[in-house]
Each structure stands twice: as C-alpha cells, then as structure tokens.
Amino acid sequence: MKKLLILITIIIAVYIGYEMGNGILNTQTVQTQSQTQTQTRKPESTDTISQIKNIFDNIKTKLEGNENTNENKKETAKAGKNESQTFFERLNNIRNIKPAIEKYKQNENFVPSNEIPDLLKKGVVATEDRRFYEHGAIDIIGLTRALITNYKANRTLEGGSTISQQTAKNIFLSHERTITRKIEELFLAMQLEKSYTKDEILTLYLNTIYFGHGTYGIKDAAQTYFGKKPSELNLAECAMLAGLPQAPTAYDPINNPDDGKRRMMTVLTLMTQEGYITTEDALKAKKEFHVKKG
C-alpha cells in the first residue's frame, strides 16, 4: 500500500514537472555538460535530474528501436554528440513519437479505425477506461477509485492505467513493474494524447493489445475466435473481445467457454450502464453468441 502511494506521488510530481518543463524549454538557457563538470560539488538535485535523464534515454532508445538498422548505426555514431545534450534537449528529442507510430501502422495486420466496429470501441471504453474521453494521459479520479477498491478488497481488483498508458506500454515498453517503467509509460502516454485524437489512440490500442490464445491485435483475434474480419463482428462478439484484455487466459471463450460467456455478459452490462446499448440489445446478444471451435 505504501509503495503504491509513493508511486502515485512520484508520477503526479513528474507529470507536473514535465508540464512546467515544456514552458521552460522555450525560454530558459541551460548550461552545457562541460560547464557542469567544472563545479567542485554537485547539489543533491543533480542526482534526481540524472535519474530522470536516464529515463528519457531509455524512452529514446525504445523509440529508435522502431527504426531500421541503418538508422540505429547512425545514432550510435552520434553517441558522443548526444552525451553533451542538456536535460531539456533530451526531453525535446522524445516529444515527437509520430514517426515510430506511423511506421508501426504500416504493418499488414493493422486495422484502420473505419474497419473497427463502433460497438467494439464502446465496449473497450466501458470496460477498460470509462472516463477515456474526459481525461488526459492519466486519470486521477480513476486511479484514486482503483486504489480505494483494491485497498478495501486487500487485493488488486482494478487497474489505474488509462487506455493511453496501456497503448504506450504495448508499443514501446516491457511489462516489468518498476517505478522507472511507470514514469516512462506516463511520458509516452502524454505524447500520445498530444499527437493523436482519442479515436486514433483507441485504434492503436485495439491493434496492439493481447487478446489471448496467442493473438495480438483485433485482426487476429476476430479471425481466431470467430473466423471473421473485424468489420463483421456483431454486438456479442464485440463484447466478448472487449472483455478479454484484463484476463485473456481466464476468459478465453475457446478454452473456458463458461467463464468467457460470463465475461461477455459483464461487458454487456457495463455497456448498458454507460448508455451505449439497451437492456434488450444485451439480452439479444446473449442468445446470438457463438464461438468458433478451436
């Protein structure tokens, strides 16, 4: 519990500091590394800044990992030059994540927004991040709610990550649970929110999330579970897929059909509560649900 509170405090502090840093970047002249090295003593804040610099370096490396080998070689050749970059210069280098993401979208399995059913998008929002259209990269209200719920239950029942954070993690980061990775995730999620619309972020999420049964992305998931293209999915199938990311193995409708169907009904209930569908729609969908045999 204490670790989680500390993590939340750090994330909020970094978030505020980053936004302040954006303004400072345009007005402040920062000392070069060579000037800093002439100082005989370093203040304690220098260690903190150095740690955050390392985080930016890690993110920059992951972004560059999406480029081709030749580009990586060029960056390696420039290593000496990059070492002399200031904190805010490094920050500026990771602000534009579009090239890496646009290249990712060229993947043959990438499904554009207009081929993804609106009901699937609504099912994901109702299940994963119901305030998705109301908050930015981080949802303080949702995070607080999850914290309280998990504390009362004395176990993890709800996650606090937004769809934007999950998308950033899916594309750029590993799934290790460390403070450094969480901060990296937040910075990248902020860039997603600044560079893309909500619908574009949701489309990226659906193309990168793990749906279980060895499938990543909505194209493979729709084919694996239902033998269909994403655009052909009905309400029941959309609800089933929207409910998988939280526990894809447990809710796998092929290996665990009963649990999978219960999960589908939970998602339909959530969609009804959010006003996306009617109770009649949910009951009809339950009767129409059929899974492709494994």
Regions found by a protein language model. Name each.
Residues 2-294:
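Juxtamembrane regions of bacterial inner-membrane/periplasmic proteins
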